[in-house]
């Protein structure tokens, strides 16, 4: 197959959120990049509190940063021009081209629709001019027809840019054939004309047993299934949003310990959790068992408690108090148990949070485990950062409104230039820096300190855990799955020629 003939763009839509859109796009990106194709990802609009900072100080969804890495590219606001960061069930922070613009509700958002359509169209056109292939990812599901009028990322994008659409469904959840059929059936005829085929995700067992169902799906829709991606036990990439972070569930696939002891980590699954991927670096370590928890009883046998980031720090702090987790953290810390807070979690560990920006609650007492006072400012800090933690070079990124007004504890590290960052008091650690735990040497030092405080004398950190290499291996595994299980000639034809003409329309009462 001639690699130079890979040209064009398509949209990967899903029957539901978390159906496999992000991982399929990442796998396709990696597969094409390995073949020397100039490829870029694009998600017109993302709704997620898992984000990263670009080189120019913008903010995009974590999934698009991962897809960019799969392409061999640095993250850019071009890949995710519109980001919605939920702060409550009814409002989200609107980020356009990497910058926070305002807070919107569902009805307010309509006022921005015209401008956002222009932004999305400009960025996609620019990417298509600069790259051989642009792989677009939808948002949620195109079957949410109540949102069709304001849609920027699904059929609204496909219609505007004349993109062929692949619909992916997760068979592990059951009902995938109905989901695929129904997704097409509820669409308007003009939208149906762009649905060119299907992909089944997370299939377990003998694929030949699925063949009769796929044959019937083709007969009913006139569209082929371009591939069946098998369930991969070893695949656990960065969660795109909170749907991928399940409470009271393990993180990753823990490898056996190097020494005699395990370290047990309880990571608090906050309602408005952000950048949950910080915790995944801990789960990469052999002998470290990490669980997301929502029940205070889960903290009783934890060696380390982690408070991750939050898009609604004060609201999530109140949730901790209501359900008893705040008291459980206090008991854990009182007996010398290690606690780590990252960004919003760090702010919660302090003595007071003054928030007239996100919650409007004013001064709110923190958990009091650090001598720290934080005040929220309207402008968000967005930066890639580097520094030094006790002789170890470290790096990360900052995304927060909170400013430290007073810190009575020693710093956890120093930023480049010498500014103090973070806090440490006994076995309580805190930092505003996301991504810090991805620095391998720092993570090992921290875990050694945690093990000492927790009395896990038999725990030994592995000397060679490389989080960046693990992520790269995950992307290569995804690319292998795509390469081995998708109809690549059909995919190449779709990219080059678009959706075939004359695809049948599935009539339904909803369309009459």
Curated annotation (Swiss-Prot):
Q: Which GO terms describe its molecular function?
A: ABC-type vitamin B12 transporter activity; catalytic activity
Annotated catalytic residues: 343 (nucleophile), 434
Q: Which UniProt keywords apply?
A: Cobalamin biosynthesis, Glutamine amidotransferase
Keyword check for Nucleus:
no
Q: Which GO terms describe its biological process?
A: cobalamin biosynthetic process
Q: Which domain of life is it from?
A: Bacteria
Q: What range(s) does the GATase cobBQ-type domain occupy? A: 262-442
Q: In which pathway does it act?
A: Cofactor biosynthesis; adenosylcobalamin biosynthesis
Per the similarity annotation, which family is this? Belongs to the CobB/CobQ family. CobQ subfamily.
Q: What does this protein do?
A: Catalyzes amidations at positions B, D, E, and G on adenosylcobyrinic A,C-diamide. NH(2) groups are provided by glutamine, and one molecule of ATP is hydrogenolyzed for each amidation.
Looking up NCBIfam families in the UniProt record yields: cobQ, PRK00784.1
> What's the protein called, per UniProt?
Cobyric acid synthase
The species this protein belongs to is Rhodococcus opacus (strain B4)
